[in-house]
Amino acid sequence: MTAYEMNFDGLVGPTHNYGGLSYGNVASQSNSQAISNPKEAAKQGLAKMKALMDMGFKQGVLAPQERPDVAALRRLGFTGSDPEVIARAAREAMPLLVASCSASSMWTANACTVSPSADTADARVHFTAANLNCKFHRSIEHPTTSRVLQAMFASQEHFAHHPALPAVSQFGDEGAANHTRFCKSYGEPGVEFFVYGRSAFDSRYPAPARYPARQTLEASQAVARLHGLSEEGVVYAQQNPAVIDQGVFHNDVIAVGNGEVLFYHQDAFLDTDKVLGELGSKLAGRGGNFQAVCVPNSAVSVEDAVKSYLFNSQLLTRADGSMLLVVPEECRNNASVWRYLEQLTAGNGPIREVRVFDLKQSMQNGGGPACLRLRVALKEQELAAVNPGVVMSLELHDRLVAWVDKHYRDRLSEADLADPQLLIECRTALDELTQILKLGSVYPFQMT
């Protein structure tokens, strides 16, 4: 049966700012307090979506969250009218206002974990919203994320939605950023690869010392159970704690997989040989031929991998079966990374082409091409059941660019977040967006 991988990119929200909220994310920390350009950020993301659509890839869009999140501030004790809540938070607890304004939902790789119908017990596509409980600014996303996903994938015949796991550190879940699926073809049963940073309940597992491990083994196992995955179709691997301490806060900063190929750094995992062996044997059991492409430390250091976001790239299968790697501009600007990529594409391995995109506004907050997209493998009838309002087309692209031009600022500082007019601008924009994308009422301000 014909099936496709569809990428749903996050539309950058109108409050995109550099709050430096993500401890363990080097770019986020180092660009804290810089002036952001929400209009440019949204257009850079839309340009990538259009370019991939023009290349023949299936492309969709995922709506941003309502920000500032006044309801979250109310839960923290701020009272009064909505503008009064924002003014009081700005006066008494600016870091909380900054967190409530974060546009981090643009990184839809963290929205949820997706298992395609070929892998699940009930032959439906399963979604589990990620609790993102490691960071306050992201932990408030999942209720709206769930509503948006249900509006996009509404058919109960084809799609199953699970709420986020319990919001405690033992079940810390960062979604698809720590999940990859290998398969011979998208419509056939595959092997789902879950990467975790630590175990919550077994102290024998090592853990990083400097930065937090955001994903637990127990969270990954729970998602696999919820999705009805068989043991033959799942591999768990522990991320190398040493690279977490070097700024590799998600697996998608040090590895990317697609089809039968895993592109990874030499230091990405613990027990690498065992992990690769299990992936190879389980994929062979499902008719596939696993190919591992290892980038050695001698070619690209972990530091350069993190600076350039070499692995936070999109690995896409072209019509002829070869693969395309979509990387940020920062890869071209890093001598050792670019030298490696030129050698990689000149060889006779599976990755034959590299495409470079300018995603500077997202990159400065620590999110590259892979962060910005959620992959969903869909069979023909499932694709037909997706809400057509979120499927990218030339008409939708142009409409969204015009919408951004109409509603977004081209300069946003931390002080601007306290502007009561910003709240009105954002709600006006999102109200219009839900009509453009045919989502219905998904935002708290639309539901009161």
From Swiss-Prot:
<feature type="binding site">
    <location>
        <position position="110"/>
    </location>
    <ligand>
        <name>substrate</name>
    </ligand>
</feature>
<feature type="binding site">
    <location>
        <position position="214"/>
    </location>
    <ligand>
        <name>substrate</name>
    </ligand>
</feature>
<dbReference type="GO" id="GO:0009015">
    <property type="term" value="F:N-succinylarginine dihydrolase activity"/>
</dbReference>
<dbReference type="InterPro" id="IPR037031">
    <property type="entry name" value="AstB_sf"/>
</dbReference>
<keyword id="KW-0378">Hydrolase</keyword>
<feature type="binding site">
    <location>
        <position position="252"/>
    </location>
    <ligand>
        <name>substrate</name>
    </ligand>
</feature>
<dbReference type="GO" id="GO:0019544">
    <property type="term" value="P:arginine catabolic process to glutamate"/>
</dbReference>
<comment type="function">
    <text>Catalyzes the hydrolysis of N(2)-succinylarginine into N(2)-succinylornithine, ammonia and CO(2).</text>
</comment>
<dbReference type="Pfam" id="PF04996">
    <property type="entry name" value="AstB"/>
</dbReference>
<comment type="similarity">
    <text>Belongs to the succinylarginine dihydrolase family.</text>
</comment>
<feature type="binding site">
    <location>
        <position position="365"/>
    </location>
    <ligand>
        <name>substrate</name>
    </ligand>
</feature>
<feature type="binding site">
    <location>
        <begin position="19"/>
        <end position="28"/>
    </location>
    <ligand>
        <name>substrate</name>
    </ligand>
</feature>
<feature type="binding site">
    <location>
        <begin position="137"/>
        <end position="138"/>
    </location>
    <ligand>
        <name>substrate</name>
    </ligand>
</feature>
<feature type="active site">
    <location>
        <position position="174"/>
    </location>
</feature>
<feature type="active site" description="Nucleophile">
    <location>
        <position position="371"/>
    </location>
</feature>
<protein>
    <recommendedName>
        <fullName>N-succinylarginine dihydrolase</fullName>
        <ecNumber>3.5.3.23</ecNumber>
    </recommendedName>
</protein>
<dbReference type="GO" id="GO:0019545">
    <property type="term" value="P:arginine catabolic process to succinate"/>
</dbReference>
<comment type="subunit">
    <text>Homodimer.</text>
</comment>
<comment type="pathway">
    <text>Amino-acid degradation; L-arginine degradation via AST pathway; L-glutamate and succinate from L-arginine: step 2/5.</text>
</comment>
<keyword id="KW-0056">Arginine metabolism</keyword>
<dbReference type="InterPro" id="IPR007079">
    <property type="entry name" value="SuccinylArg_d-Hdrlase_AstB"/>
</dbReference>
<feature type="active site">
    <location>
        <position position="250"/>
    </location>
</feature>
